[in-house]
Amino acid sequence: MAKTTKQKIILTAKILGVCLLLLIIAAFVFRDALLQKAITHITHKMERDYNSDFSIKKAQFEGFNGLAMEGILLVPKHADTLLQIETIQTKVNFWQLFAGNIQLGSLHAKNGFLQLVKTKDGRNFDAFLPKKDTVDTGEKPNYAKLVYRILNKGLNLVPTDMHLENLSLRMNDMGKKATLHLNTLVLVDKQIESAIAVHTNTFSQRWKIKGFADPRNKQTDIRFFNIDTGKIKVPYFDERYGIHSSFDSIRLNVSNIDMDGGELHVDGFTSITNFTINHPKIANKDVVIKKARFDYNFLFGENFVAIDSSSTVHLNQMKFHPYVSYNNETDKIYTLKATIPKMKAQDFITSLPEGLFRHFEGMEASGNFDYRLNLIFNKNKPNALVFDSELNKENLVITKYGEANLSKLNGEFMYMPLSMMCRNVVFM
């Protein structure tokens, strides 16, 4: 009897195996027809849902798992072309495809552009912006699973072998133009390097991205810097908002993305050198941060999103440990905590961004201090606000005032409120 049951199981497995094999063969034989059907479906969907014309001049499979396309074009009706690419060649991981995942093994693309245009008649990408969902299902998202799924899908679309050539991102906001032209981008053996030409109405520069990228192990360490002399300038914002900003280099490191016990951990660091920003509403001169680094440990759970307290922010010689979280398990609770370990008061003063706190510039102090902040806000119970601020001083003395002589607060001085006439104020 047992032998008969075993034979039935073996026979069933063989039948399923043969059916699967026949299914694979059928898919392989008719794959070009299926591809054309898929393109037709996408074309109709673009016209129906996005009021846009989508076309591919030529598309065919190459080899066992390769796909080649030519003449990809996406044009919203009565608007400027949104996307155009001359050629794309890619290979897909066959076994991941059977598991329901699209994972790119290689990607070669050249000669194309993505164009974002705003005119008095509207924007050519409005139809593709996510629409606000007004239907409340009452279901809370599981933040850990949601973010992990998005990261996995995104990283699966990053190939391990990539060659991009002559691709551009063009932006035109009512005449305010910026073009980021990707001359080349190569990812081979986990090493990535690119050359980018930037052109705006106000400047032209050449940028470079170089470093390590391993999408399958979810790790990267890349550096972004200027090929030419001088700082990298941030495009578009100078014309659009009057914000002039620049920096020497940016580094991004992702060392760990891991789901453990229902919680998602994302760890790494990012840093920037010689960051400068100028805008009249920020300060009357350049604000400069010479060195800044953020060692981050993001944590996502079923009901919360947090920057863990093991994270560290370095600002010149100063460092502090932030904790920021949002929790909606019962109520919507926002938490902000910050801890500055014991440090020299003078190091704190010299670490402040240059130009932002001008009254501290030139100030000298002796002694040490540490600081702790605890802020908890329950949106559903605002009266239960928690705010604790604790400064512990150790022989803390201001030995020299900076640009502003704060000792004048002990005497008579002229005070001019915006809504009143000038008057003398005396502090007793």
Model-derived regions, located:
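Tryptophan-anchored aromatic micro-motifs
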Residues: 158-169, 229, 272-274, 391-393
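Flexible beta-edge/linker motif
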Residues: 58-130, 141-170, 190, 195-223, ...
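N-terminal type II signal-anchor transmembrane helix
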Residues: 2-51, 283
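Interface amphipathic segments
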Residues: 81, 99-102, 178-253, 261, ...
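Transmembrane beta-strands of outer-membrane beta-barrel proteins
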Residues: 222-223, 266-268, 334-336, 385-387
